């Protein structure tokens, strides 16, 4: 067995162990409050971008209770949980303090870049009718801000759940209340 294979295998095991730990860690109240503060900072930055670009506007979607429950569950699984597992849980170290700062910034920056790039790529592959939206500078700026927020809360909490909650809350609020559903038609 080559040394490279052993290194890759041990790195993969470490990533999976980090993910398992991140999925089973529930932050304490103080950590949730810190993550809430970070989310508040995200909202302060994101709303002006969204309003000025027209990506955010008061336009509640007409949804039945069953549609709310169904779409809420679906949006929890994807994009919130699935994307946070991939782009935070698998790509980022759970214990960021054990990594040299430069390496952590490089890995976090690369994970963020892949996260942002995945949105227009997914649109090209699965929803070509919204490629223009997903490639627009304001949308990519908001995606970057959300990715930064989720990265920060993951690294602070060492848990996947604050970033999943933030991701889910942001997506459902945009789709259900702030015109996102209309923009995706």
Predicted regions and their residues:
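N-terminal signal-anchor/start-transfer transmembrane helix
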Residues: 2-3
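Juxtamembrane/disordered regions of integral membrane proteins
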Residues: 7-11, 18, 23-24, 53-62, ...
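Transmembrane helix-loop-helix hairpins at the membrane interface
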Residues: 47-54, 68-185
């Amino acid at each position: 067995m080559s040394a490279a294979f052993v290194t890759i295998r041990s790195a993969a095991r470490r990533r999976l162990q980090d993910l398992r730990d991140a999925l089973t860690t529930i932050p304490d109240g103080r950590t949730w409050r810190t993550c809430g503060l970070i989310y508040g900072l995200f909202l302060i930055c994101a709303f002006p971008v969204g309003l000025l670009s027209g990506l955010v506007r008061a336009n509640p979607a007409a949804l039945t209770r069953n549609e709310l429950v169904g779409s809420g569950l679906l949006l929890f699984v994807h994009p919130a949980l699935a994307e946070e597992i991939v782009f935070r849980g698998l790509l980022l170290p759970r214990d960021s303090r054990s990594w040299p700062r430069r390496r952590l910034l490089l890995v976090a920056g690369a994970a963020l870049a892949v996260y942002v790039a995945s949105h227009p790529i997914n649109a090209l592959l699965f929803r070509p009718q919204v490629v223009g939206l997903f490639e627009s500078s304001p949308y990519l700026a908001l995606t970057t801000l959300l990715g930064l927020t989720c990265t920060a809360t993951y690294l602070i909490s060492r848990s996947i759940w604050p970033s999943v909650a933030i991701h889910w809350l942001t997506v459902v609020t945009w789709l259900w209340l702030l015109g996102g559903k209309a923009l995706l038609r």
